[in-house]
Amino acid sequence: MEESQSELGVEPPLSQETFSDLWKLLPENNLLSSELSLAAVNDLLLSPVTNWLDENPDDASRVPAPPAATAPAPAAPAPATSWPLSSFVPSQKTYPGSYDFRLGFLHSGTAKSVTCTYSPALNKLFCQLAKTCPVQLWVSSPPPPGTRVRAMAIYKKSEYMTEVVRRCPHHERSSDYSDGLAPPQHLIRVEGNLRAEYLDDRNTFRHSVVVPYEPPEVGSDCTTIHYNFMCNSSCMGGMNRRPILTIITLEDASGNLLGRNSFEVRVCACPGRDRRTEEENFLKKGQSCPEPPPGSTKRALPTSTSSSPVQKKKPLDGEYFTLQIRGRERFEMFRELNDALELKDAQTARESGENRAHSSHLKSKKGQSPSRHKKPMFKREGPDSD
């Protein structure tokens, strides 16, 4: 068989050759050649890095270290917003001035349906949020041209007077009552007056609204300004149930004071109910009523027989008073009235004394004689009694 293949000149297949024959078939520049040593490989790969470090030794220290796999730190809470305190506390004392400046309010009851009501006994205005509150301005003579009316709110209690009265964060961000004219943090607004200016004092940080003074219309004796209070008295982050005062000042064009007046304000959901409750508590405590300024047009409290408690009659005291009366005829009238009252008191005292003596006499007589209706009881002794 072998002789026949050699004779025909056919070469055996590659799989039948030896390994040494296959090794010799590889090219001479093979990468797997034994002539390529490990040192040559290191020089080929590491020489660029070595040259860069030799040329820039300072940059090697600035090579950033790989970031460490640490847990993310919790976010720090946002700092609480602290509003600046005001170093200026405006006066709240009533000052009529040379123009006899005073305030007036419309008469309104204590029904649940009212949205704004004023209590003369408390000198306090009760109103709902963003509802119309008419305030009347009275003067004895027209002020000079350029006179302005300023409204500013301050806290009533002394421990909060340095804080600026502003709306709560909820109502500041709310767009329900935004008119685009007043800043969102202002509490007091003027309704229906495009000439109103809302001012933020850079020194005192206080908010105020200023409108030009307009003389009364024909047939009217006073000027009326409609104010709105844009936050409830119970709002957290705002007034927070702290009572406030609204100061109304009359100023000339240069800012000089011409008159001042003030009143307390409570912004609530039911003004009529709150006014009735506070007036009843006020009468129970027996506190002295704050006197309105002289010549004020503030309405008097309507007499109510249901809410006011019945006052007990006090006993007569022994004090004497002197009353100066002008005119002889009026003096005789009061003298006769006084004599009649003295006679009545004497008769009352005499009758009470006689009744007291008669009642004591009857009691003593009853104690001495037995009653005629009662029969005397005797003890009978029988034959069986021992």
Swiss-Prot record:
The modification Phosphoserine is found at S15, S20, S33, S37, S47, S175, S262, S308, S385. The modification N6-lactoyllysine is found at K112, K131. Residues 345-357 have a biased composition (Basic and acidic residues). Residues 1-313 are annotated as: Interaction with CCAR2. Binds 1 zinc ion per subunit. Residues 352-356 are annotated as: Interaction with USP7. The N-terminal and C-terminal disordered regions undergo liquid-liquid phase separation (LLPS) following homotetramerization and activation. Post-translational modifications, such as phosphorylation or lactylation affect the ability to undergo LLPS. This is Cellular tumor antigen p53. It comes from Sus scrofa (Pig).
